[in-house]
Design a protein with these regions (language model features):
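Short, glycine-rich nucleotide/cofactor-binding loops
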Residues: 10-17, 115-116
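Short acidic, Gly/Ser-rich segments with clustered Asp/Glu that frequently serve as metal-coordination loops
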Residues: 14-22, 219, 228
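Glycine/threonine-rich flexible loop motifs
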Residues: 110-119
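Electrostatically charged, flexible surface regions
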Residues: 151-278
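Alpha-helix C-terminal capping segments
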Residues: 90-96, 123-134
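A cross-family phosphate/adenosyl-ligand binding-site feature
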Residues: 2-8, 19-98
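Hydrophobic/aromatic beta-strand patches that form the interior of the parallel beta-sheet core
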Residues: 35-37, 77, 103, 136-138, ...
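Glycine-rich phosphate/pyrophosphate-binding loops
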Residues: 129-151
Length: 278
């Protein structure tokens, strides 16, 4: 009986030609058959949005496949929609069977703290998780097009193998963020490969974005705006958070769940209605 190799579905929000997704495919190519379905262009900030009023198209990128890897086990497709559209389209139209794992990334820029809520790469991962497929997002704190992803290789390979072997709890995916290495972050005894101090499983930090809009004036007489903003970590000294881990040279792994219910607030909110609605 033929033993089928695992099937990995990979997407991102930086576009199918981004360096991060190309290197991710190369890093995990020996773990199974790979289908890439990613946006035609950058779709950062699209979170879990999907296209309800726009027709979608898929394009097989044969030349990219041969340029990316000389492997017949890799298919690369682009979609004109959002990152979540890419996952939905791949599951409905491309994948020959249910994927064993969905991977988002590698994202150019971190998705820690509240940034995870805006991230299209996290949208990919949450969509996979909602389909009960073990899903992981990988991001690097470096927005440059030519970012160096090589230091991420050992841990990405280790985590991919672990998730393929053991799966993840139902309704839980992983948000994995790598710090940008600096000379002061030298490897420590017991640290992980790539020069990181180690790995911390941590919670999402509370943070806020301010000064988010910049107004400009066009020479033709009308105003326009750019979304920019400045992020502030509201708890910089909290050592159990993803931002603290990244700021101190650790890889931050945040288990993230589909269930958004604030269970700790249910009793308090229920009290509002006891007198008139009991």
């Amino acid at each position: 009986m033929e033993i089928k190799r695992p099937l990995l579905l990979i997407s991102n929000d930086d576009g199918y030609q981004a360096k991060g997704i190309r290197q991710l495919v190369e890093m995990v190519s020996d773990y199974g058959d790979i289908i890439v379905c990613a946006p035609e262009d950058a779709r950062s900030g699209f979170s879990c949005a999907f296209s309800a009023t726009t027709p979608l198209r898929l394009i097989r990128r044969e030349t990219l496949t041969s340029h990316l890897l000389p492997l017949t086990s890799v298919q690369v497709w682009s979609c004109n929609g959002t990152p979540v559209d890419c996952v939905k389209m791949a599951l409905a139209e491309i994948c020959p069977r249910r994927p064993d794992m969905v991977i988002g990334g590698i994202n150019h820029g971190d998705n820690a703290s509240v940034n995870a809520h805006y991230s299209g790469t996290m949208g990919v991962t949450l969509e996979g998780c909602m389909k009960y497929i073990p899903s992981v997002a990988f991001s690097l704190c470096d927005h440059r097009d030519d970012a160096d992803f090589e230091p991420l290789r050992p841990l990405i390979r280790e985590m991919t193998a672990k998730v393929l072997a053991d799966g993840l709890p139902k309704g839980v995916c992983l948000n994995v963020n790598f710090p940008l290495l600096h000379t002061e972050f030298s490897p420590l005894e017991g640290g992980v490969g790539g020069g990181y101090k180690g790995v911390k499983v941590c919670r999402m930090a509370y943070g806020t974005w301010g000064s988010e809009v910049t107004k400009c004036h066009h020479p033709r007489g009308y105003d326009y705006w750019w979304m920019v903003g400045h992020y502030t970590n509201d708890e910089p000294d909290a050592e159990d958070t993803d931002r603290w881990a990244l700021d101190h040279g650790y890889v931050a792994i945040t288990p993230t769940q589909i269930d958004l219910t604030a269970y700790s607030a249910m009793s308090q909110i229920s009290e509002w209605f006891k007198s008139n609605h009991s």
